[in-house]
Amino acid sequence: MRSQFKDEHPFEKRKAEATRITQRFNDRLPVICEKAENSDIQEIDKRKYLVPGDLSVGQFVYVIRKRIKLPSEKAIFIFINDILPPTAALMSTIYEEHKDEDGFLYVLYSGENTFGETEMKRLNVADLELDFDSVN
């Protein structure tokens, strides 16, 4: 996953900024939100966000939709480390699982499902099967 923010700012500067943010706003998560390359969706007007940890992924997607003024009939997908996260997941959980070594969580958005893998697809189907005979 390529990030324009990473290209523009050296690692040490990014790490120092993320550390400063998490110390100053301990209930907020430093998130970088950028448009996926080759996506025909609108550019977002700002890419740095301080996101409450109790915000769901679905609520964050709503914020992105509003920032890019995306009509409700148009689709939007967000990707974190090439994965489509569950909309009910809390941003704090996603942050802990996927934050970059610099301390930021990098989110890509696109008008199409460019990576095609969801968190559910990564699970082993056998782990989800239940033997109904053993439930009795």
UniProtKB/Swiss-Prot annotation:
InterPro entries from the UniProt entry: Atg8-like (IPR004241), Ubiquitin-like_domsf (IPR029071)
GO molecular function: phosphatidylethanolamine binding; protein tag activity
GO biological process: autophagy of mitochondrion; cytoplasm to vacuole targeting by the Cvt pathway; endoplasmic reticulum to Golgi vesicle-mediated transport; lipid droplet formation; membrane fusion; piecemeal microautophagy of the nucleus; protein localization to phagophore assembly site; protein targeting to vacuole involved in autophagy
Protein localization: Cytoplasmic vesicle, Autophagosome membrane; Vacuole membrane
Keyword annotations from UniProtKB, A to Z: Autophagy, Cytoplasmic vesicle, Lipoprotein, Membrane, Protein transport, Transport, Ubl conjugation pathway, Vacuole
Residues that make up the propeptide removed upon maturation: 117-136
GO cellular component, one term: lipid droplet
Lipid-anchored residues (Phosphatidylethanolamine amidated glycine): 116
Modification(s) after translation: The C-terminal 20 residues are removed to expose Gly-116 at the C-terminus. The C-terminal Gly is then amidated with phosphatidylethanolamine by an activating system similar to that for ubiquitin.
Record-marked site positions (Cleavage): 116-117
Membrane topology recorded in Swiss-Prot or TrEMBL: Lipid-anchor
Major place of residence: membrane
PANTHER family, per database record: MICROTUBULE-ASSOCIATED PROTEINS 1A/1B LIGHT CHAIN 3-RELATED (PTHR10969)
Family: Belongs to the ATG8 family.
Protein's job: Ubiquitin-like modifier involved in autophagosome formation. With ATG4, mediates the delivery of the autophagosomes to the vacuole via the microtubule cytoskeleton. Required for selective autophagic degradation of the nucleus (nucleophagy) as well as for mitophagy which contributes to regulate mitochondrial quantity and quality by eliminating the mitochondria to a basal level to fulfill cellular energy requirements and preventing excess ROS production. Participates also in membrane fusion events that take place in the early secretory pathway.
Protein name, UniProt field: Autophagy-related protein 8
Organism: Debaryomyces hansenii (strain ATCC 36239 / CBS 767 / BCRC 21394 / JCM 1990 / NBRC 0083 / IGC 2968)
Encoding gene, per UniProt annotation: ATG8
